[in-house]
């Protein structure tokens, strides 16, 4: 799949998320309009282009079933504990998906620096929307986001988005 960042030279900053709404390659957004999502792999910097990153992530999405989640209680994140989030109850399904995504990126020699060891899936509350405790959602997409792309003033651009369509991890 060709992406808007295909073949672009130099380092790029990226993040891998599970969006709550459909996102397509090429979609852009500002800081204030970040689509609601669960971060799967924290931001990382690499000179590897979007096509190679996507080629590593796409098979993972294809082999992973959609992930049903329930929104749990609210919490405050960040160094000052001033960022409102809603915790995500996932029945333990996101940690292996996260590890597999990290492994796929590391196989390309992507340096993930210091991934969090205390991963707590959550959705950050935004002015334009939020989730509520008790909401039941199904995470159906794995999405690669280019942060602060150099040719635009937007905060992010969707470099690739793949359906979670596999049977892996599905209940018997």
Task: Describe each model-derived feature in a short phrase.
Residues 75-85:
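Short, basic/glycine-rich phosphate-binding loops at helix/coil junctions
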Residues 145-147:
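Short, conserved, GDST-rich strand-edge loop motifs in beta-rich repeat architectures
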Residues 1-70, 76, 90-143, 153-158, ...:
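Basic, often amphipathic N-terminal segments
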């Amino acid at each position: 799949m060709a992406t808007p960042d295909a073949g672009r030279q130099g380092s790029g900053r990226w993040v891998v998320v599970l969006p709550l709404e459909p996102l397509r390659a090429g979609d852009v957004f500002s800081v204030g309009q970040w689509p609601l999502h669960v971060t799967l792999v924290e931001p990382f910097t690499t000179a590897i282009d979007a096509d190679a990153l996507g080629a590593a992530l796409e098979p993972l999405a294809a082999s992973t079933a959609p992930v049903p989640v329930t929104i749990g209680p609210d919490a405050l994140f960040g160094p000052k504990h001033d960022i409102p989030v809603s915790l995500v109850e996932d029945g333990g399904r996101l940690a292996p998906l996260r590890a597999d995504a990290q492994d796929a990126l590391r196989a390309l020699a992507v340096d993930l620096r210091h991934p969090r060891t205390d991963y707590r899936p959550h959705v950050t509350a935004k002015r334009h929307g939020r989730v509520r405790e008790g909401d039941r959602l199904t995470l159906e997409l794995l999405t690669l986001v280019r942060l602060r792309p150099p040719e635009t003033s937007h905060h992010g651009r969707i470099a690739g988005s793949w359906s979670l369509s596999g049977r892996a991890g599905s209940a018997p």
